[in-house]
Amino acid sequence: PYTTLFRSGEGSYSKREMVLQIVKEYVRQFPDTSFDELKATFSRDYLQRFAQNEFLQQDIDKAKNWKDLGEDHPHYFTADKDILVSGDGVQFVVCVEWDKNNIINVLGIAQALGWKFEIVK
């Protein structure tokens, strides 16, 4: 079953899309944040059982070439519109591996940013 999250005034997102939007909004609100600071905020540990991946991956070629690495699906948002840049100029992408358990900490960041959202199953 999929969970849909509605961000006030913006419509619905899947869990993975919501995480991407949270990171994008964080980067927009805090544009001077370095990549290391972003990695500290968006901890790899949040991924829990998917923590073999990075939450924020700066090796975009590796993220895009998942088939060549023998993976069965992409682990990152790699469309050009989803490649983000930290305050110190590091390009990075966001992991897609989110479920109802590991998204909780990321939603906490959204709440700290003042976002209003609801969870619909």
Task: Give a label for each model feature.
Residues P1-K121:
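Intrinsically disordered, charged low-complexity linkers and terminal tails
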